[in-house]
């Protein structure tokens, strides 16, 4: 597996992976697709239009795209790992942790990650990431979702990222 920065040429691949990601998330957020079958895309558009405060990364196994990660708040003191997705055949074999570590190597310093408490696999995964990256020096708190007062709050993990490993293979 290798990780590379996404750019505007990756629109079709990212749009397809994004649809799978949003479909997966709908199980935990209750979000239905729009009438055209799509889901919200504002984060995707931030990455694809080159917003300087956002960065997207694609994960590949050989020639096959197997996931992505979006980072935001790049000019802020605390960066946010905003979206993370791996296709099902490559989950639970260590590639997700490896991909996150490679992305984080580009963004040292404090990092926040939000996830849904009703997603037990995400809870285990993000706790493991925080522990692998920063030992036992991380925090977890529930924060309300902006503009959605009736929604279940997200869980946010905060840690100091000191990851430096990067993939050198194409």
PLM features: residue spans?
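Short secondary-structure junctions
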Residues: 3-4, 134-142
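A short beta-loop-alpha structural element at the N-terminal edge
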Residues: 1-19, 25
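A short helix-loop-beta-strand connector motif used in the catalytic cores of GNAT acetyltransferases and
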Residues: 43-58
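Conserved acetyl-CoA-binding loop-helix of GNAT-fold acetyltransferases
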Residues: 86, 92-105
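Conserved beta-strand-loop-alpha-helix junction that forms the acyl-donor binding cleft
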Residues: 113-127, 131, 141-145, 149-150
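Acyl-donor (CoA/ACP) binding surface of acyl/acetyltransferases
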Residues: 141-170
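Conserved beta-strand in the GNAT
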Residues: 58, 64-73, 80, 85
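Conserved GNAT-fold acetyl-CoA-binding loop/helix
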Residues: 22-45
